[in-house]
Design a protein with these regions (language model features):
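Alpha-helical transmembrane segments and their immediate juxtamembrane cytosolic regions
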Residues: 2-426, 437, 461-463
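Intrinsically disordered, low-complexity tandem-repeat regions
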Residues: 424-428, 432-440, 444-446, 450-462
Length: 463
């Protein structure tokens, strides 16, 4: 079974590094998200053992505020890859529709430019449709988990679709830079920023319709607030821009060609991110007091840590194999990475069952455990998703949510009339001159007002 080919054969080779990186990234996301579910029933501050404290120290250095920027970079990479493929295939389709193309006529420069422009518009519309559907999926997911990230990525796709399709990197860099400065200023001013968490009511929780409805409504409001925060004053947009730019290089498609650079970025990024978060992490395991800028350092330099993770994971995955096969952990991670939305949403389902549904039905209270034990639960949830993906892989199936998104995007496309290519402009032609006939094409005689049309070639009636 080929492991690097996409589910739709027309898309061609699918390089392993992005998929392997997504697969391991989802483990980091599970570890980063599980504290949002692991809440004490009465809302009190949970006791922290020494094991929990040192685990949170390690998690802050290498996981927290690194997983989601990594996710955003891979999302931007995927969007630009989709755009590139759509423009390439669409350009050929439009060129094939030109008169004489079937007979081997070479397109003129203005026709080639027209075909590429039409394909670019199609790619822009595709990204926007995908973004709107992701926003809807994110809203539904946010009713259960207001820290959802799918909606934020969908909104980024909608807002940046035109700039991405036209590869306007100057505007993209400017947008990412402005948001980075705004984010840093916000972190320094506030000292803390909530990433969204599940709601826990005070006192004993009971399974009642009123509580359930209040929980859903509150989650929806939190999701809307978190959505704006994630897009405007988090580092999702800068990370997505970096990922989109990477799609126009071979750093991820052929990492074997860039060993020295990727090793430098990988180790340097992880070390820089860890150093920036070190003091803040130390406060979780010792009696060291928190500095006002600790959160800003951890969050802002989390992007450096995410770049480090991506570089090392790309090196580990390597380039495409001659036989298209992956083995071992690469095979497992790739199977998960190619079904990233399904795995991400499945994690929410499993966390909800483990920490909420079953304990509430059995004891009437949410489940709570130590942070280190919760991390083991996150690992177990990720492994369960790995098994699911391997079963889908064996059957040759995409993830159900990937299929749902792909189907929704395809069926929501509106058919629009294709404008004809602009008339040719030949060298030496002056404004107002009639177009010069192309070789082998009979030009039409101009019709003057009040004159009958010129007779057409062919048999004439007898006098």
């Amino acid at each position: 079974m080929r492991m690097t080919t996409s589910f739709t054969g027309s898309r061609g080779v699918r390089y392993p590094a992005p998929d392997v990186a997504r697969g391991f990234m989802l483990l980091l996301i599970a570890v980063a998200n599980v504290p949002s579910w692991n809440k004490m029933p009465n809302g009190a501050e949970p006791p922290v053992s020494s094991v929990d404290g040192w685990w949170m120290f390690v998690r802050t250095l290498v996981v927290d505020h690194r997983a989601y920027p990594l996710f955003a970079m891979l999302f931007g990479f995927g969007l630009m890859t989709m755009i590139n493929r759509r423009i390439a295939s669409g350009t050929q389709t439009y060129l094939a529709s030109l008169p004489g193309a079937a007979e081997g006529r070479e397109p003129m420069p203005h026709e080639a430019a027209w075909a590429r422009e039409m394909a670019t518009i199609d790619a822009y519309r595709l990204v926007r449709r995908r973004g709107w559907w992701m926003l809807l999926i994110g809203f539904v997911h946010g009713l259960v988990f207001p820290g959802d990230i799918i909606g934020a990525y969908g909104l980024v796709a909608v807002l940046l679709a035109n700039l991405l399709a036209r590869k306007n990197y100057s505007a993209l860099y400017l947008t990412g830079g402005i948001i980075s400065v705004l984010a840093l200023a916000t972190y320094l001013a506030s000292g803390t920023l909530s990433g969204g968490s599940t709601l826990t009511a005070s006192g004993e929780q009971s399974v009642s319709l009123t509580v359930a409805l209040l929980w859903v409504v509150t989650n929806a409001l939190q999701w809307a607030v978190v959505l704006v925060v994630q897009v405007l004053i988090a580092l999702i947009v800068p990370a997505a821009v970096i990922g989109a730019r990477l799609a126009d290089t071979d750093l991820l498609t052929h990492p074997e060609r860039h060993h020295r650079l990727l090793i430098s970025v990988g180790l340097g990024g992880l070390v820089l991110g860890a150093l920036a978060a070190f003091h803040g992490a130390l406060t979780l395991a010792t009696t060291v007091q928190l500095w006002p800028w600790d959160f800003a350092m951890t969050e802002f330099f989390g992007l450096a840590g995410a770049c480090g993770w991506l570089a090392l994971l790309a090196l580990y995955a390597g380039g495409p194999r001659p036989d298209g096969r992956l083995t071992g952990l690469r095979r497992l991670a790739s199977a998960v990475g190619r079904r990233s939305m399904t795995v991400y949403l499945s994690q929410t389902i499993l966390f909800g069952i483990i920490f909420g549904v079953v304990p509430l039905l059995v004891t009437g209270r949410r489940l709570w455990m130590g942070q280190a034990a919760a991390a083991l639960v996150a690992l177990g949830v990720w492994l369960a998703c790995v098994v699911l993906c391997l079963l889908l892989e064996r059957g040759g199936h995409a993830g159900p949510f990937e299929t749902l998104l792909r189907t929704a995007v395809a069926r929501s496309e509106r058919r629009r009339p294709t404008p004809p290519p602009p008339p040719a402009v030949w060298p030496g032609m002056q404004p107002g001159m009639p177009p010069v006939a192309q070789p082998g094409v009979q030009p039409e005689a101009p019709v003057q007002p009040g004159m009958p049309p010129a007779p057409q070639p062919g048999p004439q009636p007898a006098p």
